[in-house]
Amino acid sequence: DVLVLLAALLATASGYFVSIDAHAEECFFERVTSGTKMGLIFEVAEGGFLDIDVEITGPDNKGIYKGDRESSGKYTFAAHMDGTYKFCFSNRMSTMTPKIVMFTIDIGEAPKGQDMETEAHQNKLEEMINELAVAMTAVKHEQEYMEVRERIHRAINDNTNSRVVLWSFFEALVLVAMTLGQIYYLKRFFEVRRVV
């Protein structure tokens, strides 16, 4: 019974990885009722300078949030009216680099009607399960965020490591060439030339 109740109380969360080509824009839509809490968490995982333009618009085409060249972010708001909300990621500023963006759209519970709010007591177990569900969702999002950050930093470390190895090989070749050059020069310096 508790598991069924927990599954019913969990807020919906949609997590995605999306590839956005250069000069392109990708939009996602969520239909909610007025007063519903919504959140967007995003992170640019790969591509260029790891930046993306983000825009959230309401059903009335009113801008709720706009961010330019952001690499990650968290934004939470309450729906101001019933309708479809639009979440857009734009890579129009990039000339040739596609970006891979990880994002999660959290949709909270719809606000309860007046008749439910006037009840004398709310079930304590239901409240605790709801709090636990919210905490579990937050932990899941943080873990996904850390996985993306780890992937980014691993790529940077691998790139740096390969450059250091290549530079070391180059330095070794230069050292060998200089050694051979000095040996040749010193041999010629101490050679006795005979004039016949």
Swiss-Prot record:
GOLD domain segment(s): 25-107
Similarity remark: Belongs to the EMP24/GP25L family.
Annotated motif COPI vesicle coat-binding, positions: 189-196
Subunit structure: Monomer and homodimer in the endoplasmic reticulum, endoplasmic reticulum-Golgi intermediate compartment and Golgi. Probably oligomerizes with other members of the EMP24/GP25L family such as TMED7, TMED9 and TMED10. Interacts (via GOLD domain) with TMED10 (via GOLD domain). Associates with the COPI vesicle coat (coatomer); TMED10:TMED2 heterotetramers are proposed to be involved in coatomer association. Interacts (via C-terminus) with COPG1; the interaction involves dimeric TMED2. Interacts with SEC23A; indicative for an association of TMED2 with the COPII vesicle coat.
Motif mapping: COPII vesicle coat-binding: 189-190
Regions of this protein lying in the Cytoplasmic compartment: 185-196
Statement: the UniProt record of this protein carries the keyword ATP-binding: no
Chain ranges on the Lumenal side, renumbered to this chain: 16-163
Gene behind the chain: TMED2
Source organism (scientific name): Cricetulus griseus
Signal peptide: 1-15
Stretches for region Required for TMED10 and TMED2 cis-Golgi network localization: 113-152
Function comment: Involved in vesicular protein trafficking. Mainly functions in the early secretory pathway but also in post-Golgi membranes. Thought to act as cargo receptor at the lumenal side for incorporation of secretory cargo molecules into transport vesicles and to be involved in vesicle coat formation at the cytoplasmic side.
Coiled coil: 112-162
Subcellular location: Cytoplasmic vesicle membrane; Cytoplasmic vesicle, COPI-coated vesicle membrane; Golgi apparatus, cis-Golgi network membrane; Golgi apparatus, Golgi stack membrane
Keywords associated with the record: Coiled coil, Cytoplasmic vesicle, Endoplasmic reticulum, ER-Golgi transport, Golgi apparatus, Membrane, Protein transport, Signal, Transmembrane, Transmembrane helix, Transport
Name of the featured protein: Transmembrane emp24 domain-containing protein 2
